[in-house]
Amino acid sequence: MLILRGAPALSAFRHSKLLEQLSQKVPAVSGLYAEFAHFAEVTGVLTGDEQQVLARLLKYGPSVPVQEPTGRLFLVLPRFGTISPWSSKASDIARNCGLAKIQRLERGIAFYVAGEFSEAEAQLIADALHDRMTQIVVANLEQAAGLFSHAEPKPLTAIDILGGGRAALEQANSELGLALAEDEIDYLMNAFQGLKRNPHDIELMMFAQANSEHCRHKIFNASWDIDGQSQEKSLFGMIKNTYQMHNEGVLSAYKDNAAVIVGSVAGRFYPNPETRQYGAVQEPVHILMKVETHNHPTAIAPFPGASTGSGGEIRDEGATGRGAKPKAGLTGFTVSNLQIPGFEQPWEVPYGKPERIVTALDIMIEGPLGGAAFNNEFGRPALTGYFRTFEQSITTPRGDEVRGYHKPIMLAGGMGNIRDEHVQKGEITVGSKLIVLGGPAMLIGLGGGAASSMATGTSSADLDFASVQRENPEMERRCQEVIDRCWQLGDNNPISFIHDVGAGGLSNAFPELVNDGGRGGRFELRNIPNDEPGMAPHEIWSNESQERYVLAVGAADFERFKAICERERCPFAVVGEATAEPQLTVTDSHFGNSPVDMPLEVLLGKAPRMHRSAVRENELGDDFDPSTLDIAESIERVLHHPAVASKSFLITIGDRTITGLVARDQMVGPWQVPVADVAVTATSFDVYTGEAMAMGERTPLALLDAPASGRMAIGETLTNIAASRINKISDIKLSANWMSAAGHPGEDARLYDTVKAVGMELCPELGITIPVGKDSMSMATRWNEEGVDKSVTSPLSLIVTGFAPVADIRQTLTPQLRMDKGTTDLILIDLGRGQNRMGASILAQTHGKLGSQAPDVDDAEDLKAFFAVIQGLNADGHLLAYHDRSDGGLLVSAVEMAFAGHCGLNLSLDAVAENTAEIAAILFNEELGAVIQVRQDATPDVLAQFSAAGLGDCVAVIGQPINNGEVSISYNGESVFTGQRRLLQRQWAETSYQIQRLRDNADCAEQEFDVVLEEDNPGLSVKLGFDVNQDIAAPYIKKGVRPQVAVLREQGVNGQVEMAAAFDRAGFNAIDVHMSDILAGRVDLNDFKGMVACGGFSYGDVLGAGEGWAKSALFNSRARDAFQGFFERTDSFTLGVCNGCQMMSNLHELIPGSEFWPHFVRNRSEQFEARVAMVQVQESNSIFLQGMAGSRMPIAIAHGEGHAEFESEEALLEADLSGCVALRFVDNHGKVTERYPANPNGSPRGITGLTSRDGRVTIMMPHPERVFRAVQNSWRPDEWNEDGAWMRMFRNARVWVN
């Protein structure tokens, strides 16, 4: 084993944060130093050259002075017997660099902690420094040799039920954490006595996962009686009723990993499987929809819990039909009170929590980062979501109970696209190869399906922790690339059947695969790729290692499939083959036995059906009179409530522009305020049709009136999605995610009554279908604190997500008030028809109350009429701004519109209030509705259209936006409230700031918080030195000559398709080139005029951002020659964007005239930054930017390591003076800036793009390829037509070639 010291592992900011954490736990800690330690398993002795290559490979990241360590060593390593994702990628890079003697590289962190402390304190320090699921702590570097020890496989265990009877099975149930019910134990006893043998632990584990509540949805399929009355339908039966009543537009429901609905016809853009040339294929582009929850893991370990939640949902989409493509994601969180230190709110009463779960604040610091990190690295934009906190002591017939979300809701969902011929699964022929695609087996996430089916606190803490999986998004990206290559083959798609691997691991996925395909299967356990050879058979078969799919590929298609996997460097293995008889057999060649041999019907057959008996309980509630409250104080409380406050901290961490198909994200208008009601994507790059997603949830209402909470969730979804241009309400399809504390008094009846209200009544009345959903039935947390039994139980929680095809993405409405459209009116549409019910409102919650009357959907016809009128007004161009009324009521809707419009408000309540006692209820009730802005001269016509639709009583003019920064509300000429917009907006932004300050670099958080106070901030703007609508490449395109550009990617790159689309539009033939093509000599760069290195996370940014990719080009002789030859050709051009920019900057020794280029390192905020930033094009030789110098315009930013670090002050000066700086960040006033967030990475002198001296090679961190169409821009000037400003850059390259 070789030991190589690495660079310091912590930035100054992370160092001081960790030191503070440690000294809080152990006050004796006086100092801390951390550095990476690398370990190499080698065969033979490395030559001098090989040592040099290895040393350069392991030098990565920012330049930080290395210290001589002092203090006690805590060496954190991957768990012995495992291979970390870092190791597999770094080892791949080493092999690609020609280091054949390196068997494996592994990395640890050496923490040196100064101070005098006891062994018990040392244990506390060790606990704080590692993740016990995947890591261990040792005391010296030599002990790392254990990383490369090879463990012996553990044997199979039989459970002696023939000798020990039922008691033996009960003991196994408890020890293995199987969560089997009494009748299931009876069922298994009968089954194995019938087979005349003892079951193996692997078979019991497999049965428990496959038959857990999590996988089988027993409660939703159960028979019911309520108050002694037998009920006709199951819960699932009532959901399916929506499909039986209205199934038009639904292509697949209830039977696959996601539902599929009809989309639009468009030119789907992808590389031709034979020629690898990108092009558009005109075809129906159907929409798939899915929303998952990952609540249990997120309570225990929020980052991996939320991360693998997003990863699992992405796999569900990819594994739909015969393979599909995920497109856009959403994330939601519901937690208990945050209790932010120093920012505790008056309604937050501390109640405590069990040891085994983390605090609500920790969930909201770590969880969103996990979800965002997976989506970012996979390459899926995160475009909408919700965040709610609720925790309150409620008086019930049994005394006081705390209701809240100690077991959180973590929602991960999204939509994708699928080809018409792949919507239905294919046929599995006998002899088909049964394949696992993706990562290796590891001992993580064991028993997750069963664990998540229990109330938190009823299983052991170790089992809880063991059931959380860990993530490797770059592996999932490789799998998706394989799936993409397969569906792009159309009728020749080699995949006949595919499932994702989720709860229960392969033990659930493979039996489900063969059973759904009407077959049995024979499997060999030792064919499963395994990074933990010491595992027992049941651990190999049932672990929930992530990023895996199982599929059936016909024998005739196998070679083609194998070639695709090898090109994408995606691991796969043939584990078994399909058999005609429905028997499940798993052999083990190591031990020469058969751990599983059973008929499929024993595993998946009719285990006993559950029956539920429920009793209705009187609804809860208390008295709440808002009329006595101080309005100004009420506004501040409501604006601080997390459900209302700015969600900025959740949004800027997630890439929202990847794919180049995003038409509407959360951030709205020139000031980029996070208030959008709906997310919208384009079908493809050549049309204006698209897809919309929006969410609705009103969970606290369920405590007052559960069916009302369900109806309101659907109502809110519709008032949100109404902001997009949808032809008719029945085009909208819903996903319903149900969370309940099943078995808690009153909750089962609330669940049944709410499903009935939604499935049998409201949805059929609206003509809307629910083709997909998910349930989580154990939403309670119980623990004992100093002898006192405590519990927190969630309200019944229905989270609804709406999906729909969009007729015209250009007509999406936003809440931004327009001050450039003359005199305008604000109109309130109140679907509550003046009832102003205040039950469970945010105002009530901020005073520790529930109220008594819940808002509700009283008449489905009102909702239908509202939707139709809004769509008509939008189609006619009458609506300037739109915002639904939701949490916080009318007051919040109106001020959020003012925040987005950077203006004031003059509101009068004369038309809606009858007396002063009603004012608070009118401002803060959360009945369904919306506020719209229309031109004053159109107001009479707009009101008349609502009247004609039967909504005349619901509409009233409530005021006007005004150009000064004042918000004033009056009634009968008397002032009700007056305040400054910027101060209200600061109150609204403060909760987000407080979390950001704890999570990220606090200086950056403060700078962003201060921007809100800038009254004179002009927002984003465009100042161009060229005509955006002129196509300067047109004369060359007309000649029909299309030069070839190599669209270069490496494993983990995810931005290639939009890059190809931009070059294609500019008149190039864009060709898909993988680094594996260059390393294998399949592609010759001499065939290309241009090369572009795309954005993403090559090798998951192992060995530094873009550095592994660059080094596999520098240290592989064939690749080095190819790149060097290309760069030296004077007729060639090169572009590197984001990860491609980082990669190219590390190739500067091959690129003439780039010797002073910087290295790109971690952003100053220490966070992934996804924003729209202003840049100014500099005077330079860049062939891409000719004729654009001096232009200022917005551009998409999405990176975690974009800070330009120059080798020296002299190099920075040289870059500046040589005319090689191509782009700089500027603030909204047009001044070059280093200030956050206008400069999101803190690069010196605003530098974010550079060129070589002759201008042929240009690198930049921003993403012009995501905003070349006008509709791709989060904000754009009204006068832009089809092209965005950045299209000019690609056309410049086409002109240069000629």
Curated annotation (Swiss-Prot):
Enzyme Commission identifier(s): 6.3.5.3
Compartments in which it is found: Cytoplasm
Enzyme class, spelled out: ligase
Binding, ATP: 305-316, 384-386, 676, 886
Keywords per UniProt: ATP-binding, Cytoplasm, Glutamine amidotransferase, Ligase, Magnesium, Metal-binding, Nucleotide-binding, Purine biosynthesis
Active site residues according to the UniProt entry: C1138, H1263, E1265
Glutamine amidotransferase type-1 domain boundaries: 1045-1298
GO annotation terms (biological process): 'de novo' IMP biosynthetic process
Presence of keyword Cytoplasm: yes
Positions contributing to Mg(2+) binding: D677, E716, N720, D884
Gene Ontology cellular component terms for the protein in this record: cytoplasm
Family, per entry: In the N-terminal section; belongs to the FGAMS family.
Stored HAMAP family: PurL_1
The protein, known as: Phosphoribosylformylglycinamidine synthase
